[in-house]
Amino acid sequence: MPDEETFGGRIYLHRLIGGLVGLAVIASTSLALAEPSKIVAAENFYGDIAKQIGGPNVSVTSILSNPDQDPHLFELSPSVARDVSDAHIVIYNGIDYDPWIEKLLVAARSANRKTIVVADLIGKKTGDNPHIWYDPATISALAKRLSETLVAEDPADKAGYQQRLSRFDESLKPIQAKIAELRQRFAGTPVTATEPIFGYMFEALGMQVRNQAFQLAVMNDTEPSASDIISFEDDLKTHRVKLLIYNSQATDPIAERMQKIAKAAGIPVVGGTETSPPGENYQSWMMGELDAVERALSKHAP
């Protein structure tokens, strides 16, 4: 019976409390720059990057930060509406991943507020896999844009922002080295997942991802076809795949069924949440995920 690993993943939010959008309209919209600059991030891993780049000059609020909460049940609150309304800078994923924040931004418009849509930085569009923080290019692009945005708002500390950006880029090198190492060892390895939370990283690692139609159906909240379910089960039972990744923060009966089949067949199972764990920065979170995948695949490596 394989051990179960844990790492982080992605967020989908489908329930919006429409009445709260109105609260954003009546919230204060005065965005005169003060110290520290107020940054709101829809996802906590983006908020962490804002803290690393902004340093002592920013105050960061991350809206989605509880790995024990089912993100599908996330509900807006008056405090969230106020935070977004009062922010100098708002960061969110985009491409239909966090549409609730777009509603709040429309409801509390401000010519002075800067908005960073992370998907736009790397040319992703609606319909693309939204778990873009696993694309190695994404985080570097966000850090660079944050530094530029903060310099424009606070040119007196230009050197500080640039120094923090340089340190951040340097801190990503161990992750890049780990990706290169795992790609050399495991490129071409057939793997699968109940949904495509790790898709961009699998691509960076050069792995062969199976059951993508099944994953796409789950991502779009539709029932996988009978043939897709049968193919998935067969891949697990016949050891056609070497690893199963599932979302431990928002699961359903069919995903739980695939986990049971994988464990019974001796396929390593790696579970993950949809927010970064408490007490970890982006770098330690990503390295932990890569380590979990490495441990799982090493158990059956030749």
Question: Which residue ranges define each predicted feature?
Answer:
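N-terminal secretory signal peptides that target proteins for export/translocation
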Residues: 1-14
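Extended rod-forming repeat segments used as scaffolds/tethers
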Residues: 10-11, 19-21, 105
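Bacterial N-terminal signal peptides
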Residues: 15-30
